[in-house]
Amino acid sequence: MYSKLKKLLVEGINNNSFFTLFLRLSGVLFIFLTTFLFTNNYEADVVGQYDFIRSYFLVIGSLIMLSSDQTILFLIGRYNNARQTIIDVYIKILFITFVLYVLNYLIFLIFFYFDFFLVNKITESLIMKSNLVLFFYCIYLINIEILRALEYTFVSETFRNIIKYLPLMVGFLCLNTLGKSNEIINFFIYGFIFIAIFSSIILFLLFKKYNKTYDSHYKKDNFKFIFKYSLPVTLSTVSLYLLSSIDIFFLKYFFGDNYVAYYSVAFKIISFISVAINAIGLSVATALAYNYKKGDFDALKKIVNSSAKLIFYFSMTFSVFVLIFSELILSVFGKEYLISQETLVLLSIGNLIASFAGNTYMYLLMTNKGKVLGKLIFAAVIINIVLNLVLIPSFSLKGAAISSIISILFWNYLGAYFIYKQDKINILFKFK
């Protein structure tokens, strides 16, 4: 088993996935750096506003571009990433995104005008600013996936994990010097205009050098096909984003921005586990797809067993560390964030239990069970909404954590059960 894992690591270094993982971990470190700078220089309500808008961009941005950052590689990869395919798909996706962007802006404009949303003026202002910039946010995400299709993976991941935070870092530097710290959220929002323009320039320059020849079998995808393929993926992606964002939306509604900040800090600490699970999942993704297509279920069992052990042992090590040093970790962000210590402990235990389910997400995705995955996550979102409505008003931060844990356990273990019934493969971690 370990020789196979060693082989996977060597292959990962050779095909740049090691460097991709390095950049993704760098992205997590940047998230912690921005959180540290926020929590040590701004009031908790400002930190909460930042985390609320960050979640808003994730969910609404994915909706208006129909999760093209997830689907674009499929749409152009079918024709070997040929030049004319990239141009055609890129133009169609930008058109769809722009139409939905305008529609989204008008809907919120009408809703706020007639007071359909019961939010304060600060939140309303933040949402409308974000709606104005959403198109640029989507352009940036679409651009970096095109860069990946052009085989500039390193450039793509650098934009995703490092350059994305540059406007915010400039904001920290300039505003603290000028004494206008209350403008920091604007740097985050409007920074996506700069990133969209910069990524577009880089994409244009690199695309000029791209010479992959015309594919004689190429047939232009119509808008109907793009919608038909993208909608199920959008359901899965938005549902997944909602699972990590609904708690924040409800905490903001019931308790305000400061509670969003307290919860988000704990949630970001636990995000290290998610990064590790995703990295392990990516390292075996192609092997899962290949062996499933061949019908080699013995090989599949070996892959899921080895990845399940890696996921569990990493989760256990990290969770134990967090449980022992939870107070020390939270105090780094400021004494007021110690209020979320019990929340951090709950999330750690919950994620450790979830890690027993192994690599459920990637297995379903790579074995042609994407629709099942989408339905599972969507059901988990509904459960999460109901639990949040019941638990958050009474238990605040702990209620949000419990809701999140139950939802995650639901879709992971139900997914593992479905895999066992369908493929006769036990994807759960086993000690032997």
What are these regions (language model features)?
Residues L9, N14, V46, F112-S130, ...:
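Interfacial segments at transmembrane-helix termini and the short loops linking adjacent helices
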Residues E11-D69, L73, V133, K228-N258, ...:
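Signature of the first transmembrane helix
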Residues Y50, R54-S62, S236-L240, S244, ...:
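Transmembrane helix-bundle signature of multi-pass secondary active exporters and lipid flippases
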Residues I64-N81, A149, I270-G295, K301, ...:
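Helix-loop junctions and terminal segments of transmembrane helices
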